[in-house]
Amino acid sequence: MKNIMKRYLNQLLLVALIASAFVVTMLNTKAQQSQTTPDAGYLSPTAPVATGKAPGMKVRLLSESGGVKNYVIVLGKRDEVMSGLTDFAKENKITSARFSAIGAFSRATVAWFDESRKEFKLIPIQEQVELVSMIGDIALSGSQPVVHTHVALASSDGTLRGGHLIEANVFPTLELFLTAYPASLHKQFDPATTLKLIDPTLK
């Protein structure tokens, strides 16, 4: 009986040692990953915007007077909003603009700027939502136009979520009106936030 109990205790001890070693290995692996890869829930303000992801985008110049141009831009099913607007700004050499839009998305990612981390905290929305409001501007960072937009999105129960738009896939449509100005607006790096912010005094 004593031998059986001894073998049983030895087996329990062996299992405990194996489990402890496994836990230590997993914790070390997780720590190494956190040091070498970015947090999937956050995004750097300098992250690039993908291009060429809005093949269904349609554009029409509605009017032009004194260098001010008014456009209507319509994005179709599955077009990605930030990609399409960035492509439009580059192709039309937009150096300063403002815009607003309505429509709907099949999915979207908005964000909230975390001052302590100096990064955007991502808020994924994996459902069909109505675009209640979308406003934004375009200005130059160096020689490249940068699109900056905020949105308010409504779920099927009327719940609103919103923030800085990171990406969104259109369904069924996005109807956007944009006014472009002849004078350029420039962004300047702000070391306190690591953001590039519009400085209207720069020319």
What are the functions of these language-model segments?
Residues M1, M5, F22-L27, A47, ...:
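A general, composition-driven signal for non-globular sequence regions
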Residues K2-A16:
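Bacterial N-terminal signal peptides that target proteins for export
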Residues T29-A31:
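Boundary at the C-terminal end of the N-terminal hydrophobic targeting segment
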Residues Q33-D79, S83-K90, S96-A97, S106-V147, ...:
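N-terminal intrinsically disordered, cationic/polar leader segments
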Residues I102:
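Active-site-proximal beta-strand/loop segments in catalytic clefts of secreted hydrolases
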